[in-house]
Every structure is written in C-alpha cells, then in structure tokens.
Amino acid sequence: MKLIYHPVFLEHDTGMHPENPKRLEAFEGLPATEVPDGTPWLGLVHTEKHIENVKAACAAHRHLDPDTVASPGSYEAAVRAVGATILASETDDFALVRPPGHHAYPGRSSGFCLFNNVAIAAQKLANEGKRVFLFDFDGHLGDGTSHIFEDTDQVLYCSIHQYPAFPGHGWVDEIGRGKGKGFTMNVPIPPESGDDIFMDAVQTCLQVLEQYQPDVVAVSAGFDAHLHDLLLQLRVTEGSFYKIGNLLRERSPNIFATLEGGYNVEVLPKCVHNFLAGINGKEMLYNENETTSFRAVWEEYELRVNSVMGNLRSWWKFS
C-alpha cells in the first residue's frame, strides 16, 4: 500500500479551520499521482441537487454548513478526492486526500465533508457485486456513511468512535434496518479511552470481519483518536494504528484506505506512516508509551461493548 496524493487537495482553502491544507503539507516530499476526476461517480451516492449546491457554494466562497467551509478551489479538490479514493480502491492504496468524506450525506455536506469519498468507492464496488467491510476508526462516527449503507447487507459498516461527541449518535442500538439490519456495527468508546480500550474495540470488530468474509476492506482512516489530537478526548498512541494495519493485513488481501480526520499536524504523518507500515508488513516506525484507561472508563466501556455484542448476536458470534 502506498500513498496517493495530488497538490490539488491543498486548493481547498479553509483558512484557520482545523481541517486545513497544513494537514497534508506536513507530509513532506510526496510525489504527485495523477488522479481521475470523480465527477462521473458522484451520483452513486449523492443527489444532483446536492452536487449543484456544492458547486455553487464553492464558486461563491460560502459555508455549506456552520462547520463546513467551501472556497473556489474546493470543488475541484473534492471531486479529485473522490477520484483518488476510487483509484485507491482499484490499486489497494491509501488516498491521502482532503476534504474528508465520512460525514457527508446523499443530500448535504456536513462535518468538514463535501462528498462522501469512501461511500462512493464502496458503492461502486457493491454495484460490481463485491461485499465490502467498511471499517471506520476515525474518532468520530461517520454518520453520512452509516446512513448511506444502513439498509444493505452488501456493505457492512463498522465504526469505533468516541461517544458522546460529534455528530451525537452512533450508539450501540444503531445496527441497520431492513435488509441491512445487523450490518451496521457501532462501538462507542468513552472519553479518556486509551490504547487498551481502543484495541479491544478493534478486536471486537475484526471478529465480525472474519465472519462476513468480504471481498474488499475499505478503511475510513481517521487519526483524531490520537492522544494529542485537537478535537476529541481519546488517548490513543501511534502504535495502535500500526497494529490496526498489521491486523487487517492478516485478514484480507484486498484493502484500501482514504484519509478522514486527524488534526494535529505533528502527529498525523506518523500515524499514517505507522498504519502503512502495518499494512505492508514492515517494522513499526514510531512508538510512544502505550496508554491505559482508568478503571471507571473500562467499566463504562465493558457495559457498552457487551451491549454491542448482545445486539448483534443474531447475526455474528463473539468470543
């Protein structure tokens, strides 16, 4: 797995917003990859009205919602982010893109996200008859992605995220509906959770991955669960992202990823490169002292994860 990057992603001008070009500028010396224009695939997930609204907002340099900035360069960056994620899905690579995507709904932008990059790529794969395990370890629920796939069993959405936190849902009882019931898995971890809880949640998710037997694993790779990130109260270190990569490599030959959150520009490159090292079977590049969670946090987590497993036992086995 290698990084797919293009300087067009820096043209999404958000000023002093936490999601700003410095996030990718922190990755020094990256070669530019030719990435396709994602416009032909937007309609796999998004309404025509939404696509036109994003285009108009970018041209007018206005916000799409209170948290989501648009600038004249944002539309081109956003459609290329979609294209880069499609390319990553074809080559088993990591799309290092912005704007991110997992909060975007079919009909609206949300939470720094214009179009839902990973959902579009996953829907394209599903349309080709593939089963997709969509693993979202960003510290926020990918509520747009969850909504998009809540009524299908062809894409299993699994999220580990801080709760309570934005967007305010992603609780243990949100397991999908209709044909998709049992194919949405939320593992909401408490604030102050450390590496121990985070990796326990990962192992719980991987039990379902093994049973689902997907053709492809799609990863919403957000790194805002890190101890020193700006927007959450989780205490995960760089080593956990290496472990996730390693565990996924052992379970699937077909994995691609796209960047979601991660707002500390000093640690984001380390987290991403650790994840890549794990996926590629290389040695860990960066290692911090692992964090452990206080007993009260563990007790709250255990109540939650037991509820997660209880709600999904009709579909999946847990050890």
Please name every model-derived segment.
Residues 1-319:
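HDAC/HDAC-like amidohydrolase catalytic core signature
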